[in-house]
Amino acid sequence: PKTLDQKRYVDAIDAHTVTFGIGPAGTGKTYLAMAKAVQALQTKQVSRIILTRPAVEAGEKIGFLPGTLSEKIDPYLRPLYDALRDMVDPDSIPRLIGAGTVEVAPLAYMRGRTLNDAFVILDEAQNTSPQQMKMFLTRLGSGSKIVVTGDITQVDLPGGVKSGLRVVQGILDGIDDIAFCNLTSHDVVRHRLVGKIVAAYDRYDTVAESYGPRNPRKNRKTR
């Protein structure tokens, strides 16, 4: 961790069974979770790592895409593979996946399972519905740890669908062994401009909310 909030996030992962890392792109929320997962595997705290994210961009049409199931879902899981390659020898990843030590799968494939003795990361959680979030969190099994990451400003769900990440804190806040960590543009560790870009968009969104739909000028018809 390079910032105070990142250290708090890492400490929360160590101290809690379920941790939420919420913040904009580039804050290290997924990278740090992946680092802790690999560490837990190497120190035999868990026997496997499970990485998942909702393939929301594919919607229900994934079955109509050409190719095998793996070829269909891999593009939506690519960011998780990329993060994993930063942590372990890339040549070892096929072996780890083949042995079941590392599993990368879309969120829909978690339904009906109990995830024991695993470090489980749900990425892009802003694109879960409240029902999907509940489904995922109740997969928690014995000896497992869950980290949920996401950015509530980047929701890609269809109109009218609530984000499970936006409502979950109000539901679970205050429950023992669950932590919520918020990261900001000050925690961005990518190119220095990324933090400035994130901050600029935050300011724009604040102004848009203040003067948006309720501004009569904006709603006035042009003659």
Regions found by a protein language model. Give the residues of each.
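Conserved helicase motor core of SF1/SF2 NTP-dependent helicases
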Residues: 1-6, 12-122, 126-223
